[in-house]
Amino acid sequence: MAFPTASFLRYRVRQLAAWLLVLICLPRLAHGQSAASPPFPQDDVRRPRIGLVLSGGGARGYAHIGVLKMLERLHVPIDAIAGTSMGAVVGGLYASGLHADALEQKLSQVDLSDIAFDRKERAKLPQSLREDDFQYPIGLSAGYADGELKLPAGLVQGNRLLALLKAWTAQWPDNIDFARLPIPFRAVATDLATGDGVVLDHGSLALAMRASMAVPGLFAPIEVDGRTLVDGGLVSNLPVQLARDMGVDIVIAVNIGSDLQRPEALASPAAVTQQMITILVGQNVRAQKALLRRNDVLLEPRLTGLSFADFAKGPQGVRAGEEAVSEAQARLAALSLSAQAYAAYREAHRPRGALAGGTRIDAIEVTTNGRVPVARVRQLLSVREGDVYDAERLNRDLSALSTLGDFESVTQQLVEHDGVHTLRIDAREKSWGNQFFLFGLGMSTNFDGRGAFNVNLGHRYPWLTQGGLEWRNDIVLGSNRASIHTELRQPLWQSMGYYVAPYAEYARRRSDIYIDDLPPTKDTKAFNNLTIETARAGVDFGMPLGRKGEVRLGVNYVRRSATFNYLALTGGVPVAQPMLRAQQPAVRALLTLDQLDDPLFPRGGYYLLANVEGGFGSVDKRFNTAQAKGLWATSVGRHTFNVALEGAGQFGANSPTKANGGYSGDGANEGFFLGGFQHLSAYAPDQFNGSYLLYGRLTYLYDLHVTDLLGLRAPVFGASAEAGNVWQLRDNFGRGAYLKSGSLFVGGNSPIGPLYFGFAAAPQGVWNVYLQLGRVF
């Protein structure tokens, strides 16, 4: 019998040692797999590992959903996902366990445009914020701190997007390793401080997706693990190498980047900036494309006519993604599995390690970074220790917090450590200041030499004290009017919204006085003008009506005067003649209901403003007024109808006469004015003055369904029919003929506010061509 050779014995010894090592390590390996999923679940060790790379591109990212739908139909397994920007959002949601059809259905049920651009449902805002967007439609807010003015780091804070992503990934704790997801996932972001690429592979999945798509200048940067991050497209918009580093054998890369525009299409600084970003991103995309190998697959859906912000065209993007896969089906077929093998793959990639249903919150940690006390944040949270974690319920609480206007962002994270689930609420105040300035512009002209211009400036200083005291100032400087209003608002019971507001204000208004032709004609001219001054100081008690509006009740002391500036009767040389002076203590009730969906071009909702003021005490001339105006809007498709009504009058005083050159004031009341755009549009501003007023308007708006028209965003074509009149005597109120006017116009939002251009006509040959900047109701 031959004896084994020495080399054979060495082989047997090594083989035995290897088996012993396997037996020793096997329990540890089994324990490790139960603690965390391996990078690639072992459904079929013989097939190549496939990585999916999804690029950024905003709304064009809907194409990724179409790609995923087709890959599922072809039974192509995905073992790892690397994504950037919108690709990180779609990829992260898919990796978390949302299949393509479920993802498409979820996105179809939300308005991603409103969510991505942080458009809040206006009806749910506090009344103070609704007041501001009425007065300052530009929407620009500058902060002031440390002796300098600052602007927000982004036009959009991204709070609604983050909340949505958190709700859709709520089954995963916020300190998870992304390798534990059903499909291992990585997102790419850019460190704003260094310019380096950052791979996000652990922590909050929602936060990682939000950070990856923080387009500089548009979305505010976001802090993750102490680093300020922005969109990953700046460094790697198509992260092929990242997928390769995750251990895949084959890459399916989907590039949805925007195409370069022709030079003649670059008609604005914003367009040039976008072109520059597209060029820079395109350079890193080309570098990543160069890393693709022969067996890799590159998909580039045809997305002509679909821009970064065209979220409304999502279905078009989905179809483009499906078509791109269909065109590459021959190559992808080699990667597909049998039905049985694909079912095993899906089973292996079911969510494991997610939060169990009914997970209870063991502790709540709230942090703030400014003057708003932690107790205020806790007060507005409905969740308590011991409650079952409900991401959507908590998002509703955080949404209510963010709409207060005090915070830049309010985020939630549920982290698990040693079996203890801690809910962390981070409320960050606005980083661009502790005082804020608001801006607005107004202008009107009918191209005949008459016109007016004004600048609006607002100042807000919230949380002067821990009790929530706010200082509010509003200034109007214009050719025909000037005013200043200063007010302190002190909350009494913050949980109920009550407040007390001492205030002081001064207003000066100049209006032309017209010859009282009945009916008025095109030749009706102003023969003098009137300057009205009002000074008032008082204190109001404010009470909210839920989120529908508020009531203010108060007392004040008011002083009024009117001065005539005669022109025509003095050969054109103005002669000022004080005519009317009065002062009195008064009580006032002010009701505001505001449920319009938009303050400028409402498509739905209603608005009501009612003001009643009456004098008291021993005064020579007591003046009492009541005024109300309302607007109701409704829409069907692209068609919108608005109905506006207004009424005003004096009560409890002697009926005024018309002895003052056409001015209706009785020595105390300045009367009410009618005329001007959308206030009898064919006539001059404030052409009609009386002690009593009635007015109504029906307006039709047609959405032109284009993104931009002559610099106007969301332009509309409009037509209006108007009727109204003023009366001097109470007994004549509502009687006689009504003045009528009709108009046709084009309007839309411009960078400096709402803009209208149109034509108006009335009987007796009266007509106007007008250009109006600023709010009209």
What is the meaning of each model-derived region?
Residues 266, 510-516, 561-569, 653-666, ...:
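Outer-membrane beta-barrel and related beta-rich outer-membrane complex signature
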Residues 407, 432, 464-466, 493-495, ...:
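Outer-membrane beta-barrel channels and translocator barrels
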